[in-house]
């Protein structure tokens, strides 16, 4: 939203996995190449799902797309957690990422069905 600091994101395109969507959205909105890592949170209702991953910076220089954002900022964790213009959901996701020792990770799973290959995330055993 306007006057809010939000992380890049968007919809999963047909034929795309959430991880592929994350990489595409970061590139489109910021010019940054990232590599998705752990699943850190899911928010959903009957209409939409919001899936959040941690990610590693791979390459690129942060630039605004001048469409979905007016600027690209890097914030340190303490600043992101205390700024009023950072949404509560973003703050909760940062806190989840900081305490991910018991979080979900992608676990190999050999399963393909009618609508494509499954991705399975769970707590490591």
Tell what function each PLM region has.
Residues 1-3, 60, 70, 111:
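Glycine-centered flexibility motif
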Residues 1-7, 33-34, 38:
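N-terminal strand-loop-strand
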Residues 12-36, 45-97, 120-125:
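Unchanged
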Residues 41-43:
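Short beta-strand micro-motifs within the conserved protein kinase catalytic domain, predominantly
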Residues 97-125:
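Charged phosphate-binding loop/patch that engages nucleotide di/tri-phosphates or the phosphate backbone
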